[in-house]
């Protein structure tokens, strides 16, 4: 997606004056924040797990080359085709060629922030493919030609009335007098529409919460089951993930999974935690005939040599956003690129440059709540200060 980070101040001003957005954001502090607190309190070893998770991620990043090679070796042995992409353009071209080789017309997608980072949907659509988002929040914002405003809740900036209006505008094949007064009715309608997409898709594309070097597996974590249908019903499954997602062992990833859902939504575990290892075997009842993994660098190797390597520990739980007073005031779109909130204020300048995103590290009260709740103990305020120093030294 095109960055509007240089317009952050004007974006924020518009967001503060948007009454519908403010209504949508008003429930955030009392919802996800309270659920995380309750989940933490129910797990006495939560703080110990944070230390363990940090150590695992630091170790993996310190030996990233070793674990990426191990992952590739084991994934290939399990029947995967592993592709390496230096940047967004290369990743887009690799994925498009996979789709073209599969003679694809329809592509279903699970929720993937990396696909947003590389602007994958636009590229595939420009090549004549139909792309259908299957995560409910992603589907809703796709109808509106918008981008996610939150890492785990893409449509959190919308009210129920707005979603109903969009469904009535787009789902014109359904009866006009149908009742859409309750969230469950909206979900049911989306399920019926998306079911047809699953059954006719040629390629399914998902992200990966983690990649396991020990087994060559990828993991997706969802609450809707859309990821499972996306990757198992299409004949070709494509995983697109950044290189920092690799974890050494199954035991390691189990420790981190205990932190992920609790930090994100307050659940002990998400409803679906799915491991994928290679294509369908002869004895398997379902699954893809071809399994591809696209590993994206896009500046992350360069980050490893800087003080910003700590941000690569991020497991995309969104807790920093939920607890951030700035995010709670303006939402995610004001940040102007893929990653909003405190994590975006550090990651975005690291990926696209301080010149383009220098306003974001200034969008902070430096209250420190983001670091207090981060399951990976990323010192986000400290890293924002480093970006601010770079901006000052550049004279911008």
PLM feature spans:
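Conserved structured core elements
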Residues: 65, 85, 89, 188, ...
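Generic, well-ordered alpha-helical scaffold segments in large soluble proteins
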Residues: 70, 74, 78, 94-98, ...
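Acidic/polar loop patches that form or flank catalytic/metal-binding clefts of enzymes
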Residues: 248-250, 264-269, 322, 329, ...
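Ferredoxin-type iron-sulfur electron-transfer modules in oxidoreductases and energy-metabolism complexes
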Residues: 283-311, 326-396
């Amino acid at each position: 997606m095109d960055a509007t980070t240089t317009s952050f101040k004007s974006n924020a001003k518009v967001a503060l004056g948007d009454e519908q957005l403010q209504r949508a954001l008003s429930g955030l502090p009392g919802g996800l924040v309270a659920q995380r607190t309750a989940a933490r309190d129910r797990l006495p070893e939560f703080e110990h797990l944070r230390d363990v998770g940090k150590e695992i991620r630091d170790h993996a990043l310190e030996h990233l080359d070793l674990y990426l090679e191990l992952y590739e070796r084991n994934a290939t042995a399990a029947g995967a085709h592993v592709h390496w992409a230096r940047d967004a353009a290369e990743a887009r071209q690799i994925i498009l060629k996979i789709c073209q080789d599969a003679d694809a017309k329809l592509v279903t997608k699970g929720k993937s922030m990396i696909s947003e980072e590389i602007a994958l949907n636009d590229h595939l659509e420009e090549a004549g493919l139909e792309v259908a988002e299957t995560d409910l929040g992603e589907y809703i914002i796709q109808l509106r030609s918008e981008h996610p405003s939150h890492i785990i809740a893409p449509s959190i900036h919308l009210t129920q009335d707005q979603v109903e209006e969009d469904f009535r505008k787009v789902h014109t094949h359904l009866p006009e007098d149908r009742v859409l007064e309750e969230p469950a009715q909206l979900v049911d309608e989306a399920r019926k529409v998306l079911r047809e997409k699953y059954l006719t898709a040629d390629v399914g594309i998902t992200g990966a919460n983690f990649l396991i070097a020990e087994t060559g597996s990828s993991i997706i974590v969802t609450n809707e089951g859309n990821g499972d249908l996306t990757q198992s019903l299409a004949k070709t499954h494509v995983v697109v993930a950044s290189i920092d997602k690799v974890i050494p062992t199954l035991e390691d990833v189990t420790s981190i999974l205990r932190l992920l859902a609790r930090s994100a939504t307050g659940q002990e575990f998400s409803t679906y935690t799915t491991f994928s290892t290679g294509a369908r075997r002869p004895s398997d009842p379902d699954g893809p005939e071809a399994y591809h993994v696209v590993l994206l660098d896009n500046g992350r190797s360069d980050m490893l040599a800087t003080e910003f390597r700590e941000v690569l520990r991020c497991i995309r739980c969104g807790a920093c956003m939920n607890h951030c007073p700035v995010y709670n005031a303006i939402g995610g779109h004001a940040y102007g690129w893929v990653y909003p909130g405190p994590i975006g204020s550090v990651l975005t300048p690291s990926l696209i440059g301080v010149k383009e995103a220098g306003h974001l590290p200034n969008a902070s009260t430096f209250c420190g709540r983001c670091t207090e709740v981060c399951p990976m103990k990323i010192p986000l305020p400290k890293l924002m200060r480093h970006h601010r120093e770079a901006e000052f030294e550049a004279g911008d």
